[in-house]
């Protein structure tokens, strides 16, 4: 697409050092026939490890990868349209909620190109109000949630429901998340009023959440300090994944239709509760995360290509007559 940058182009982010042992471990999928990919990277993530590390791994394995930066690119949408030879096998997106990247991803999907994650799954996860209802309707343990178009409406929540956690409906990376202990405290908060808000009952915790990361077909559990307890003495580390946590993470993936995702969970007296669902998180502390993600990207491309081939094979054959129709002369 116009002004996209090849993976071999200069980047201000440090290039991922390729781990030969990891290439051997994941090479069965990574070292396949070359794929053509376009990563859409929002400005906030241009200098982050992810998704640049995935780009580096794919490029080192012989795949062609372009990086499209919406913050500085005029995208020619007509280049997305089908031709005899598709320009890309897939578009991959790491986006912010209010960024332009998702519109470009949806445009690619409208042209029939594979998107990772599926553009509909990203929409579900990005709108936190929709995500809460989707999860609850599917039986995923999720806190009761209130939606308000502005903060002054939150005073309609009964005082008995406090303390609350208040956060933006389109938030990400746990930014602008507040614990509110009383209606009076709510009135004193300097809340960004540019978008809608969610409120949920505060779930007591020991100062940390557990992030469950799914880079493909595996689940990793990482202890992370809670944004509601910034001063807590927490050792951030990988912990064993119990059958309950693995089942919960995979259930979320199925319900939302995500291939690459993470969820924030907290343990309560009634069991684990999901606090948030994120498409393409940072995958911090996941071993060989970039290689696992690269493998998943290529597997999704294969899966979608096979599904399209099966659909074509199952489609009824339309036979057209080659005979010249006979036109009767009018009397």
Where are these regions (language model features)?
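Short N-terminal or domain-adjacent regulatory/targeting segments
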Residues: 2-5, 9-31
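Extreme N-terminal starter segment of soluble prokaryotic enzymes
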Residues: 33-38
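Conserved N-proximal alpha/beta basic substrate-recognition cap immediately N-terminal to
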Residues: 42-144
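A short beta-strand motif that forms the metal-chelation/ATP-contact edge
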Residues: 90, 212-214, 221, 271-285
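Rossmann-like NAD(P)H-binding beta-loop-alpha module
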Residues: 143-162
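Protein kinase-like catalytic core scaffold
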Residues: 164, 198, 220-221, 261, ...
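Phosphate-binding site of ATP-dependent enzymes
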Residues: 175-256
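A long amphipathic alpha-helix within ATP-dependent nucleotide-binding catalytic cores
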Residues: 229-274, 278, 286, 292-322, ...
